Swiss-Prot record:
Top-level taxon of origin: Bacteria
GIY-YIG domain residues: 12-89
Pfam families from the UniProt entry: GIY-YIG (PF01541), UVR (PF02151), UvrC_RNaseH_dom (PF08459)
Chief location: cytoplasm
CDD domains per record: GIY-YIG_UvrC_Cho (cd10434)
Species of origin: Hydrogenobaculum sp. (strain Y04AAS1)
Molecular function in Gene Ontology: DNA binding; excinuclease ABC activity
Job description of the protein: The UvrABC repair system catalyzes the recognition and processing of DNA lesions. UvrC both incises the 5' and 3' sides of the lesion. The N-terminal half is responsible for the 3' incision and the C-terminal half is responsible for the 5' incision.
Taxonomic path: Bacteria, Pseudomonadati, Aquificota, Aquificia, Aquificales
Entry's localization field: Cytoplasm
Protein name per Swiss-Prot or TrEMBL: UvrABC system protein C
Length: 565
């Protein structure tokens, strides 16, 4: 019987359904109503390639009826973990991420494990096992917890004792009380809760020193130094909770942010393949089948009651929330989630512009302050990311009044001259912050210098791209385009504003003058006292400078530095 005919015979009850090809599992899913869900697959197959793949690769269809959806969820997780179906590929997290386990023994030690059921206190997870190995090595070197798997009783210690990696509890070379102090210190090191253990260590150091046990005192002193470095480097905490996993779904990426001891310790991106059918709760459920459930799980999408029950079966006191803390949200938006998807950008660009996506984009912005200190900025997008080494700032030389168009023309012309002279590479595209007026200025410069560059402008209020060939493209609903062009526009604006502020800053005077040979402390102070900004200094007449004892060459050197910036 073919699969379509089998679907008609499927039960209208909760359970799990399995697409197979002989012994190979193709896809496993769950449903409140098995037949209804399978009919949905069948219908979507006609429009979606990703659904059709399951049917094309399957020869058999099976199902298992359960009492409710919650039972179906648990069964689905077990089956996926056991059989690793082809089209549940993103759910195959295997044995989970490594953690450092502080063992629950008479003489505890640390070990790296992926088994969340082992007894002891787990710290992590570590997305990079090499980091876990380095930390374990540091713990043995600093706190000298035993290195053996099982602690035998023996008359002489092993080589690790002589190497300073173990305190030798197996040979009674350390008291149980002193070993417990080392364990407490190691735990503080792993958890970051250092301040609670430091007073005990200081007290013990004094006690050992008073009893002339200087070797023991030195051992604890080394621990204090390591732990004090943690205190000094903790900085600002991100969140007021000790332990939370944050999941952020954006486009075809699911991001995981791991917070431990109020700090962001790791993040990871799970890329979602469009050709696969993905249930985000299945993905998270499978992740927690082999990883530690934290005190709190936060997601920017709804988590069903059944999923929550499943997680609570692994940890009763777990809490859930849809509210991502603002400090972390800013980090997500600035550094990770807003990282543009290059392939999506190229696809959207070709679809909307009818031409190949640019690899090298130069984006321009003009900034001034109350009609003065007009500056220009250029930021660069190259091969899928910002290239800050190619950023340029421009101090406007030919315009003494408020005229953004004339200022832009100067900046673009100066840039064009370097391109024509082969000093710099020709970009694929110029993106100008502004509307049709700025676009016209870009086209004018392009035609004057005979440049082979695609000219566009981006109007901020409307979020519309205007192109030299007459297109007007609203980009807000095109995620990848909006990310790249919005990122470039905002970066150019930030870069220009920073330069503008620097020109208006008295502190910037000293910073710049320190780069010029022959300008000593006296001349720096004269310039600093008589000018409010570098802008005022380079605009001053030579006669005034002469009276102050400042040579014209210093002014020219400042101009050169500002021009190079």
């Amino acid at each position: 019987m073919d699969i379509v005919a089998l679907i008609e015979k499927a039960p209208e009850e909760p359970g799990v359904y399995i697409f197979k090809n002989q012994k190979h599992y193709i896809y496993i899913g769950k449903a409140i109503n098995i037949k209804k869900r399978l009919l949905q697959h069948l219908k979507e197959r006609e429009q979606s390639k990703k659904e059709a793949n399951i049917f094309n690769h399957s020869k058999e269809l099976e199902w298992i009826v359960t009492r409710n959806e919650y039972e179906a969820l648990l069964l689905e997780m077990d089956l996926i973990r056991t059989h690793k179906p082809k089209y549940n590929v993103l759910l195959k997290h295997g044995s989970g991420y490594p953690v450092i386990l502080l063992t629950d023994d008479e003489y505890p030690t640390v070990k790296i494990t992926r088994d969340t059921s082992e007894k002891g206190e787990a710290f992590g997870p570590f997305l990079n096992i090499n980091k876990a190995l380095k930390i374990k090595k540091l713990i043995h070197a600093t706190f000298r917890l035993r290195t053996c798997e099982e602690m035998p009783k023996r008359p002489t210690p092993c080589m690790d004792y002589h190497l300073g990696l173990c305190s030798g509890p197996c040979a009674n070379l350390i008291s149980k009380e002193d070993y417990a102090i080392s364990v407490k210190s190691a735990k503080a090191f792993l958890s970051g809760n250092v301040k609670d253990v430091l007073p005990t260590l200081y007290e013990k150091i004094e006690q050992y020193a008073s009893n002339l046990a200087f070797e023991k005192a030195a051992f604890l002193r080394d621990q204090v130094l390591v732990l004090q470095n943690i205190v000094d480097g903790q900085g600002v905490f991100l969140y007021d909770i000790e332990e939370v996993d944050v999941f952020y779904l954006e486009g075809y990426s699911l991001w995981l942010f791991i917070i431990r001891n109020k700090r962001l310790v790791a993040h990871k991106e799970f890329r979602l393949n469009k050709e696969l059918i993905i249930n985000y709760e299945e993905m998270l459920g499978t992740y927690y089948m082999s990883n530690i459930v934290p005190k709190k799980i936060v997601a920017n999408f709804e988590l069903t009651e059944n999923f929550r029950l499943f997680i609570k079966s692994k940890r009763k006191d777990v809490a859930f929330s849809n509210n991502i803390p603002k400090p972390l949200l800013k980090i997500i938006e600035k550094n990770v989630v807003l990282k543009p998807d290059t392939k999506e950008f190229e696809s959207e660009f070709y679809k909307l512009f009818g031409r190949k996506a640019p690899k090298l984009i130069e984006c321009f912005d003009i900034s001034h302050f109350q009609g003065q200190y007009t500056v220009g900025s250029m930021v660069v997008w190259e091969d899928g990311s910002l290239n800050k080494s190619k950023y340029r700032r421009y101090r406007i030389k030919t315009v003494d009044y408020i005229d953004d168009f004339a200022s832009l023309k100067e900046v673009l012309s100066r840039r064009a001259k370097r391109i024509v002279s082969k000093e710099d590479q020709t970009p694929d595209m110029w993106l100008i912050d502004g509307g049709k007026g700025q676009l016209s200025m870009g086209i004018e410069v392009k035609e004057k210098f005979l440049l082979n560059i695609y000219i566009c402008s981006l109007a901020k209020k409307e979020e519309i791209i205007y192109t030299e060939d007459g297109l007007e493209i609203p980009i807000k609903n095109h995620q990848a385009l909006y990310r790249v062009f919005g990122l470039l526009r905002d970066e150019a604006h930030r870069f220009a504003i920073t330069y503008n502020r620097n020109l208006r800053s008295k502190e910037f005077i000293k910073d710049t003058l320190s780069k010029i040979k022959g300008v000593g402390k006296v001349k720096k102070e004269i310039i600093y006292r008589h000018f409010d900004s570098l802008y005022d200094f380079i605009k001053s007449d030579d006669e005034k400078l002469k009276k102050l004892g400042i040579s014209k060459s210093i002014k020219e050197s400042v101009k050169k530095i500002l021009g190079d910036m």
